[in-house]
Amino acid sequence: MSDTIQQEAPDNLQVTPTHGRSFAEKVWSACLGLIQENINTLAFKTWFLPIRPLSFSGSELTIEVPSQFFYEWIEENYSVHVKQALRQVIGPEAKLMYSIVIDKSQGQPVTIELPHQIDAAPAERSVRPEAPGQKASAERERLEIARPRFESNLNPKYTFSTLVRGDCNSLAFAASKSIAQNPGQNAFNPLVIYGGVGLGKTHMMQAIGNSVLENRITDAVLYVSSEKFAIDFVNAIQNGNIQEFSAFYRNIDVLIIDDIQFFAGKEKTQEEIFHIFNTLHQSNKQIILSADRPIKEIKGIEDRLISRFNWGLSTDIQAPDYETRKAIIQSKLKQSGVSLDPVVIEFIATNVTSNVRELEGCIVKLLAAHSLDNQEIDLQFAKSTLKDIIRYNTKQLTLETIEKAVCSYFSITSNDLKGKSKKKEIAVGRQIAMYLSKDMTDSSLKTIGLHFGGRDHSTVIHALNTIEKKIAASNEERKKIEELRKRIEIMSM
């Protein structure tokens, strides 16, 4: 619950019967409709959408604004429009109360009432602590009211739950989680995340914003690309709305700007960013930025901006390693409610190594192709469907490749496989390696025997017969051989 200042508008309004809180929303909504007709769209979104109607009693409407500055700006620039709207909706005797948020700390709220006259001398303040039980009641009342928000521009799918953490992004992930819990009140301000295309920078930044909104820390969260910021800035200058543009950004609590390298060479835009940055940072507002390279490597950015961008934490996101790529694929499949053969997952994770976006693109294409012809998504289907994305050179399959695959599968060493040990897992692995070598290559029995420890051809024949019998007698054994065969095919690509 926040401490508030309440200030009374000097309007002469008619007293009407008391209505419930929901009626306050209807009254304010009607007022907004009239106000919107008389001011431009940017001003309306900036200064009126964040206002919350709190109560309506008699002829008095109480609204909440985010800050003292917010209140003063409305009164200095839009008081005529507000007054006209109130009189049309409520009547000539309407009254307006402003509830101004001045503190978000915990504790018992204190309400201070002042006359709503900007040019008047400050009135004597009367402090009225809430009575026991009123705090919880007031909080419940506020939760029941629809809470207008800034248009955050966040993708609701970009959350921490859909973001895979790995060695490639561990520091950025940890810092982002910390910021989401306490934006602006940490050592990571600004947070700068840099890295190549498609590595998850945008997902990471928007996950912070979505978490802040979900936990109702603040509604004033904005994601914007550097390109859109620059375009809006130019439009604001051309349309004479630069004051409103600047004021809008100075009232953001969590500002997220993507791809700041595009500010390079734009002197006027950098000037505006500089002042916005200073205002937000001094007010402990959170700033989150991304770039395609380290800040110091971006040419055409002013030194004073580079210095400020380095005040907090700058961390990179790298290309995901093999295990992280598998986890990303599995996460995407889980979100889609689909399962895939592990061999297909391994095939994609092995061959798509550049970025997360390509991995997700492979899954989307596979599922789309599957939905069209309802074919089973096996390895061959995956190869055929993804041939335009995954380009690989098929290498000649060697006995060494088979040896590595078998050793990995049975968790044994090459020396074990070629040695004299008769331990069951080693002996079985050796026989399977010989069987697959004969089945998948053109090597002779003699060559196979020599490769696996200098054994003669009769030993190889015995191994072939043994494995063939096991395959015929056991589905489990057949599946084991088939899985190994697929692994070897992937390794040979």
Curated annotation (Swiss-Prot):
Chain intervals for the UniProt region annotation (Domain II): 105-152
Disulphide-bonded residues: none
Record bears the keyword Nucleotide-binding: yes
Classification via InterPro entries: AAA+_ATPase (IPR003593), Chromosome_initiator_DnaA (IPR001957), Chromosome_initiator_DnaA-like (IPR020591), Chromosome_initiator_DnaA_CS (IPR018312), DnaA_C (IPR013159), DnaA_dom (IPR013317), DnaA_N_dom (IPR024633), DnaA_N_sf (IPR038454)
Protein location: Cytoplasm
Region annotated Disordered, chain positions: 121-140
CDD domains reported in the protein's UniProt record: AAA, Bac_DnaA_C
Region (Domain IV, binds dsDNA) location: 371-493
Pfam families the record matches: Bac_DnaA (PF00308), Bac_DnaA_C (PF08299), DnaA_N (PF11638)
GO biological process: DNA replication initiation; regulation of DNA replication
Record region (Domain I, interacts with DnaA modulators): 1-105
Keywords assigned by UniProt, alphabetized: ATP-binding, Cytoplasm, DNA replication, DNA-binding, Lipid-binding, Nucleotide-binding
UniProt key word ATP-binding: yes
Family: Belongs to the DnaA family.
PANTHER family: CHROMOSOMAL REPLICATION INITIATOR PROTEIN DNAA
Notes concerning its domains: Domain I is involved in oligomerization and binding regulators, domain II is flexibile and of varying length in different bacteria, domain III forms the AAA+ region, while domain IV binds dsDNA.
Function: Plays an essential role in the initiation and regulation of chromosomal replication. ATP-DnaA binds to the origin of replication (oriC) to initiate formation of the DNA replication initiation complex once per cell cycle. Binds the DnaA box (a 9 base pair repeat at the origin) and separates the double-stranded (ds)DNA. Forms a right-handed helical filament on oriC DNA; dsDNA binds to the exterior of the filament while single-stranded (ss)DNA is stabiized in the filament's interior.
Assembly and binders: Oligomerizes as a right-handed, spiral filament on DNA at oriC.
Protein name listed in UniProt: Chromosomal replication initiator protein DnaA
Organism whose genome encodes this protein: Chlorobaculum tepidum (strain ATCC 49652 / DSM 12025 / NBRC 103806 / TLS)
